[in-house]
């Protein structure tokens, strides 16, 4: 077998075929070849990649350069494979699976629908890092291959050649293991983006990959015996019914990418009388006995495929790569199709597809993989859920951070708040029994640990809006005090100045407080109500943390509960 990973945005089927045709005479059949891309956005485009992106926008000279570069890339890939064949040595293969955390789900949702690119804290991810290594007779690592599910776009699109974080990962791995050749492929990360951007961050991301590889290879790995058993097939992925000619003729009157797509669709209608409603899709599998199944999927595959395959197969023996052997475009899941947006809809234009996929596409891909890997790799009885499909909670780091802050030298005011919190914690009870009807809004935002969670809030600029809740049944202490604890935040600092907020207890105004990102304390004029805020997560604009509300001689209702509300005072 042979695997080639190219620093490029994507390798279309035509390029894979041209390379495969050259290698047949050297004993490598097309089925035994995998050609993958790192998906860096900083590489020259290949002929056949995302045809609509450059259609009508290239000069004859640029077309010539693209063709020349494509041939150059194929020449270099062929040369690399032939050198590897010539220099074959007996090696011991081993593999391990680690975890790296810089990939975040980029699909921001609003009421369950795609709202743009960003960071969705609760979205699925794949933080697994499978690693394959080859050691020589002396135990020295001579080859490395790592795989991570994340867009290779930390640097972003720049008009200069660069490998982005995958390139830095390769460089770092080869530094850590002198004399080794490394490969970095990409998993099902079509809707996963790197958290953080810029050249230095890309280097940091690459270093994170290499550090985990180094750690894994210093621990117990699983040896692999013999060459892999190779299998593969082409399946047809269903699209929704293509639009009729009249639709494309109307689109032709426009401009831009939709105009170019219409030209391509009308050309197909003129040539064959129809537009295909299926996409030809290759799936390949390498199996090392019962120890490891390596799955290779074409295109930009969303993370749900990894989540599902790791649930329905034995994830402890599974490796899933995407961007392999062809680039038909994004491969969305049922979830992504239901949410809509870029990966489900507009991206299809770039790849010269007539429309979105039918939701049956997910079952088609998953069933093909399960057929090829076979029953040996089915989910085990009582199998635990793969641990790398959700972002780790920030709670542990939060309390470590608070401990460090408490031990540091802080302002006198902050130290007073800290001392007050220490006094209140032993007797504090939960503040929220049930939420009451109000005009508060719902959103997903960062909580006290920096985790993205469902929250209700009122806007500091929306005068009169009120957030209401009722406490659980309460018991006063011997001094007639009740201390309630809840989590939340206080406003957005760069917003125009407002009057702040009013805290209401039992319908009556108790005290006023204002936007802050620092530890703070507010006391009512009659000293019967005290509100203390301890931020445990902060950004440049807002914060999240713990509130402690102390009430003196307050009268609960007939059920032993207290009605509490916060009202926005709006602009001054």
Predicted regions mapped to residue ranges:
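Non-catalytic substrate/cofactor recognition surfaces at enzyme active-site rims
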Residues: 1-549, 553-560, 567-571
